[in-house]
Amino acid sequence: LLYVVDLNKEVSDFERVSLSGYVPENIKSKGIEILNKLAKEIPQEIKINTSIEIGFPTEVIVEKAKNENYDIIVMGSRGLGKIKSIFMGSVSQYVLKYAHCPVLIVR
């Protein structure tokens, strides 16, 4: 399970300059909470690893999947709608296009 901290959304420009690889505790706690909640929904016989990364979610997901030789990427979709997705793009669309492995998008 992977939680990507998108610092562009989580912190101001001033904070971003001073962070340089550091994840503020409140953001890290939020990620851990989300990962733990998701991990409880996965059957115990399935081995999982959890990870919190920093960066652009699109690039982090694709690179991590490639570097760790993922068999499949399963991810959610925010459902931006047709108009918003045209202007804002979509993490799931990017991953679907650039991932080296199959991608399953769940609504």
Regions found by a protein language model. Give the residues of each.
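Structural beta-alpha unit
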Residues: 40-73
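A short acidic, glycine-rich active-site loop
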Residues: 19-33
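Small/aliphatic-rich secondary-structure junction motif
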Residues: 1-18, 41
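Active-site phosphate/pyrophosphate- and oxyanion-stabilizing loops and adjacent acidic/basic residues
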Residues: 36, 40, 93
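Gly/Ser-rich helix-loop-strand patches that form or flank binding pockets
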Residues: 63-107
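Generic structural signal for helix capping and beta-alpha/helix-loop junctions
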Residues: 8-9, 60, 82
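General small-molecule cofactor/ligand-binding pocket signal
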Residues: 2, 49-53, 104
